[in-house]
A protein has these predicted regions:
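A Zn2+-metalloprotease active-site environment signal
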Residues: 1-182
């Protein structure tokens, strides 16, 4: 399932110059202004948003909570203070990156969503390549699986019939639309 129709999605722009985006349970997607500015075009931004929605539709946060609950149950059997384990679980959820499998799954879901909505799917791996080739890669990429491997996987997933799409790649139109905000 690429889209969960039972969820009301909420998108928030965070005034932060760091290049980052993240999703939480309940359909909340947060995109930093730094990421919006770093994108060359609408399709690149759509790729990031599609990836974050992929985490929601993949129920990745729910899996992390289930794992924490299992760990808490095991700790009770071992006589560890449950309050201490809950605190550790919250800290782990906030600081550890999504699993490698979750990232690949969110990439696949995001790329598929891009193709279904008409955006040029090439923008997703191109944005990742742009970010890792910059002066300093964004912090969120350093906590994700090997980006070069993800780029290669994304490029392989794009069907030949979609490789020449240009929808959403107009950089000047994108930058013009941002002028009133930034």
């Amino acid at each position: 399932m690429l889209f969960r129709s039972n969820i009301k999605y909420t998108f928030q722009v965070v005034e932060d110059e760091n290049i980052n985006a993240f999703a939480t349970m309940g359909g909340f997607v947060y995109v930093n202004t730094g990421l919006i500015k770093a994108a060359d075009n609408e399709a690149q931004l759509a790729g990031v948003i599609g990836h974050e929605i992929g985490h929601i539709t993949g129920r990745h946060s729910i899996q992390h909570i289930k794992q924490a609950a299992i760990a808490q149950g095991a700790s009770s059997l071992l006589g560890v203070d449950p309050d201490q384990i809950v605190q550790i679980g919250v800290q782990v959820a906030l600081t550890l990156p999504n699993s490698r499998q979750d990232e690949y799954d969110a990439d696949r879901r995001g790329l598929t969503t891009m193709m279904q909505t008409g955006y040029a799917p090439s923008a997703m791996p191109e944005f990742m390549k742009k970010l890792i080739s910059g002066k300093s890669a964004p912090e969120f990429l350093s906590s994700h699986p090997a980006v070069t491997e993800r780029v290669a996987n994304l490029q392989r997933m794009i069907p030949a019939s979609y490789r020449n799409r240009t929808d959403g790649l107009n950089a000047s139109s994108y930058k013009q639309s941002l002028r009133s905000f930034f």
